[in-house]
Amino acid sequence: MPLRVYNTLTGSKEEFVPINPGKVGMYVCGVTVYDHCHIGHARANVVFDMIYRHLLSKGLEVTYVRNYTDIDDKIINRANRDGVAYNEISERFIKEFDNDMARLMLQLPTFQPKATEHIPEIINLVQKLIDKGFAYQSGSDVFYRVDRFEGYLKLSKRNLEDMQAGARIDVDERKEHPMDFALWKGAKPGEPYWESPWGQGRPGWHIECSAMSTKFLGETLDIHGGGKDLIFPHHENEIAQSEAASGKPFVKYWLHNGFVNINSEKMSKSLGNFFTIKEILESYDAEVLRFFLLSAHYRSPIDFSDQNLKEAELGLERIYKALAGIDERLASGAHTPADADNTEFAEKVAGFAGRFGDAMDDDFNTALALGHLFDLVRVINRELPTASTGLLEKVKAEVAKMAAVLGICDSVPAAFLQRMKDRKTSDMEMSAEEIETLIAERAEARKAKNFKRGDEIRDLLLEKNIVLLDSAQGTTWKVK
């Protein structure tokens, strides 16, 4: 089936048809680098990394641009608070962001421009808007005339008059209209600045994205993405700037991811439920966090809680255990002839792969795609003992292909499962080695028909939340 995406601009799902056949230009708003990134930033970036991966998997040539906002009031305030230069703050948190994204297994975008490296392009764009009558100078500031742009608020579906009437807007005598927004800000004493035709100053937040997206992707983009919180004012203002300057549609498809709630409440510093990526990864594996963020449809809200993270961990382990089972069969040398294969198994694998692709083509429905992947895991576990090595190799490759679109299961299965065991036992009184020693002792006791001792060991481990799993292949264990 063709790829269909939900376009915020039209409010409907549409078939995705690139402006230039076979090529896609995608711009995603990056972070303002003044502090550590939180779970909401993680979701937005994981979502658009997944979208990037899926587009690539369909054979499209994707130019993916994600910016850094490295000059802003928040950065200046942080620099003043810490008593350092603004760029010391921005460079520090760019490194922190890059480290967080690497741990979450994001592929690098094609370009990662910084606002401060594109001041000439920003100044040229502001001047163009002034020349066309869409912007005006007021002292050393430059503002955009919102009532001059006919399509203003078409993305957020708001009404300018209603907003003006219902909002508490401080009177700003520099502005012609209360909703006008800054394109260029005159520098205050002690602030960083760049020379411009309007005096020393720096760019406003919205203009930088218009300038950088146009530089790298042209006047009309295929995809522009970000969180729903950016629809207004940021993306609305980008449209106003870019379309007024070029006279062309700015973006063909607007994509926005949903919010992250914390234990069913909106995330907020004032509520004390604000978590950085760094804090979360002290308690959970990065791949588990990524898996969790993809477990819901990207446009839906997702509820971050310990219970939901633990469920994500169990789900990811299920996939890895199936892959580990395949690896063990292949490594054992046990050979099952191909003519003994269950042809229904091979057909089911192909069917699941097709349904996975269809789910991803239906507005990147990762929740449904993961459901098909879990269905495949159940079939693998059932057919594993009797399938031929040749078929298992094909199944493993098919699972890897699906997982790669989601950016999961890139670890060696046995290594991932061991990592999970180590993490779970790190706070326990017993080490993994001690548990294995007791399991070996229990096996010897049972062999000697000393079932009382065997039961004692099982009960001792159960008291410490260690559950033993007996099978024909031996005994394994898991944390309860």
Curated annotation (Swiss-Prot):
Keywords: Aminoacyl-tRNA synthetase, ATP-binding, Cytoplasm, Ligase, Metal-binding, Nucleotide-binding, Protein biosynthesis, Zinc
SUPFAM superfamilies recorded: Anticodon-binding domain of a subclass of class I aminoacyl-tRNA synthetases, Nucleotidylyl transferase
Residues bound to ATP: 269
Pfam families documented for this protein: DALR_2, tRNA-synt_1e
Gene Ontology, cellular component aspect: cytosol
Major location (coarse): cytoplasm
Keyword Flavoprotein: no
Keyword Phosphoprotein: no
Span of the annotated motif 'KMSKS' region: 266-270
GO annotation, biological process: cysteinyl-tRNA aminoacylation
Cofactor, free-text remark: Binds 1 zinc ion per subunit.
Cofactor or coenzyme needed: Zn(2+)
Listed GO MF terms: ATP binding; cysteine-tRNA ligase activity; zinc ion binding
Binding-site positions, Zn(2+): 29, 209, 234, 238
Family statement drawn from the similarity comment of this UniProt entry: Belongs to the class-I aminoacyl-tRNA synthetase family.
Record protein name field: Cysteine--tRNA ligase
Classification of source organism: Bacteria, Pseudomonadati, Thermodesulfobacteriota, Desulfuromonadia, Geobacterales
Gene name per UniProt: cysS
